[in-house]
Amino acid sequence: MIIRLGFWSIVAIGISIAGCAGPLKQFTYQASELSRSADFTRQNLLSTKMGILSATGVENYRLIIGDSLAKALKELDPKVALVDPNQAVNLINRADLAQDYTLMLREYETSGILRKGILKRVSQALGVRYLILPNLLEYRRDTSTRISVLGVRFVQTRSSTLRVLAQIWDAETGGIVWEGSAEVTLAGEDIREKPIPFEEVALLAWKELIKKLP
């Protein structure tokens, strides 16, 4: 009985310490513009709609990556008119370009090039000149214990790191007019055993990268 009381007393102390610590989130990021054509300016973004292509990279998160990019653009840069990923897919399928579109993205995975002829037809179906291609380069989750008493974990630090790349393609020339990348790490510390939502980290990454647009 004495041992049991002692154990639960320690548990109570541990919970008290964890409660005092409270939920905590730390956010670190790095974003940079990798390249930009000399003639690609802010006016180019505002003068026409921009379509968002299906994301490449880590397959399980492709839909979320594209949707979170659209959401971030609408929040931070609402003056840029968008054709979001869902609208784009519908328009591409309506134009009977599904097979060509799939081929173009598949070729990109190995060559890093979007075939100009298909890119042009896709842009016409979407009614845009510029197409932004999101790419998820890396997604990593880590967990570490900060407060542990007699093997009982009270506070865990969970972190998520995500790296993304975005390219803006000009369908008229078939070239990349802008390219940028961002890496963010979001760490959460509390007594809840809940992972940091992927959507939250992705949205933060895109917001930091969007700030680098012209």
Role assignments for model-derived ranges:
Residues 6-18:
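Bacterial N-terminal signal peptides
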Residues 1-3:
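N-terminal secretory signal peptides that target proteins for export/translocation
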Residues 20-48, 121, 125-126, 136-143, ...:
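C-terminal/domain-edge helix-coil "capping" segments
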